[in-house]
Amino acid sequence: MAHSIGNGFPPGVFSQLTRRQLVQNGVFGAGALAVGSLGLPRAARALDEINFWATGTLDIGDDGWRTFAYDSGVKVEFTDNGNDPGPVVAKLAAGNANDIYDVAGLQGGSEKELARRGLIAPWDISQIQNYASVWQWAKDIPYLTHDGKAYGIPTVINADSIIAIRDKAGSVDSYGAIFDPKLKGKTAMEDAWINSVIFTAIYLKNSENAKIAEPGNLTADELGLVMEFLIKHKRDRQFRTFWNGWEQGLQLLANQEVWVMTGWEPIVYAARMRGVDCYYAVPREGYEGWANNTILLKSAVVRGRTKAAHQLVNALFSGFYGCKLGLLRGYVVPTDNNVAYATAHANAFDPAGVRKLADHVKQKFAGKIYWQNTRPDNFQLYETWWQRLRNA
């Protein structure tokens, strides 16, 4: 499973242990609490309240949510769900999450399972006016719909690849560098199958002519091929480690224990702040695309929160949220309303920086993309294989 920084990215935003669980950290631009509206009336009114249970990196902090509420009329009570799809699905199905929360946000792939089990409700796109501004290729993500209905709204989007230290690894343009024997002991991958398996599958499909149809949703045979490849390289001591969590990934680069690794783009910027000359490679095999999607919990419909939930999602695409999230996280909300909002509120946000961040992500998605799927058809087999890798 968030990433390029853009101008004005505050120091300190990288202090937590995991990318998907980063909590608010950083400063809000001067005058931000007084910025203009999102195009909604500002008359005194009772605020609709929504309990938003989402990945920590979607949080814009207390000051951000205050402005969001003032502009949108929706008061957000934000809770970090940890992002791991397994526990999220379990808490919705057998826990009390559906009794507590109204709207959730998590890495895409679980929507169909949740819809089939009756745990989430479809969105009424006609009630989300700003959805028309969402970039078309974000709307085309394959796992957003089920039975012709929209269950996932692509709220944050990016594409991941390889981090390399320039004076150690030279020019890297392929995932093959991770498996290059010349770099033995100086490469690493994340201890998470949702990222490391698809990276390996993308490499084998495009550079080794492996018979793999969809790297994000492997068949049992394809998964076996990929995992045997990884296990062999682990036993050969190709990898320095399989890193776990933000801090370890960053530390490996900062200490130059690792010269090349698959990882999250914000780690590049954090490592640069520590004096490491590293870069995010453009892989010829293609990027791993991912989206963090907003879903409507079934119980919110029962509690009469449907209108407020749609109002929340509409406001997420109105521009302020995208500008604020980009400033805090370097993440992109896939709408040009962000640039329009920054232009109209240049005292709070840098329009050039907002545009630069959007163009950077658009450029990635103009090339070859394979979508991350956190709930592939054989996800339980993925779990089994990954444990074998850990034990190898």
Report the location of each language-model feature:
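N-terminal export leaders
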Residues: T18-V35
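Conserved C-terminal helix/tail region of periplasmic/extracytoplasmic solute-binding proteins
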Residues: D359-A392
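Extracytoplasmic ligand-binding site segments that recognize negatively charged/polar headgroups
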Residues: L58-D62, G105-E111, A115-Q248
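N-terminal secretory signal peptides
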Residues: M1-Q21
